[in-house]
Amino acid sequence: MPDIIIEAFQKAFELIFSGNHEVFATVYRSLYVSGLGTLLACLWSIPIAIILGLYSFKGKWIIKGVFNALIGVPTVALGLLLYLLLSKSGEFGFLGLLYTVNGIAVGEALLLTPIIVSFTSSALEAADVQLRDLAKTLGASSLRTNLTIMRETVWSLALAITAAFNRGFGELGIAMIVGVNIFQETRVLTTSIAVFTNLGQFDIAMAYGIILMIIVIAVTLVVNLIEKIKRDEIPEKHSVRDWILVMWR
């Protein structure tokens, strides 16, 4: 087992630094699908989260409970539902999204919606308790109070979006069922891992897995670093040691 892991790391760096066109095309395709899916999800998830997080109405907790439950929806079940809807005989077959990267992105947008809604609405509610009374004491209007709460939770939103992107980036079921893993068309990192594993080429499969993990970790670290910079946790005159200490906290 250790030999396989070592060979996988060697293969991963070979694939990265060899300039292999298919590897970079697969990585780009994965980033495109996850990025577009996350962007689409944000378009409707953020307004829903604001309504759930800042306003009270009947049935609110039922709706929140549904979104919380949908975080754990099996991706293969969602992929199957999308396949039926996007097929030629389905209600949305006229869109021509089946077997395309855009179709996968739409599926991922639906998958990521509960994550963004649940995380963001919870952050807004937590901030609401702390800030609303203070804002009213200072004479702020309801609109200004809500804007203040949203401003205070912007980094919670950023982390929710990052978590959603990472979830989509590592998703397999929708990509496999809706995109069917067409070579140079809909093949992404996760489906590549599945294919090479089935072929018994474990070193290449693990290499793709390592590349996937490197990208996910890098995206998360960059977002965390930007958050710390914006919060002035990194001094103006900083050294490499300062950066390491800040990232370690």
Please tell me what each predicted stretch does.
Residues 36-67, 142, 149, 222-225:
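Transmembrane-helix boundary motif in ABC transporter permease subunits
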Residues 18, 178-225:
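Interhelical loop and adjacent transmembrane-helix boundary motif
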Residues 29-37, 67-70, 143, 147-159, ...:
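Alpha-helical transmembrane segments of multi-pass membrane proteins
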Residues 48-82, 238-249:
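Cytoplasmic-entry segments and transmembrane alpha-helices of multi-pass inner-membrane transporters
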Residues 2-14, 18-21, 78-109, 178-182:
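Membrane-interfacial helix termini and adjacent extracytoplasmic/periplasmic loops
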Residues 119-120, 142-174, 228:
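Transmembrane alpha-helices
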Residues 1-38, 55-57, 149, 198-201:
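Periplasmic/extracellular loop-to-transmembrane helix junction in inner-membrane transport proteins
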Residues 114, 121-131, 136, 144-148, ...:
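C-terminal transmembrane helix and the adjacent membrane-cytosol boundary/short C-terminal tail
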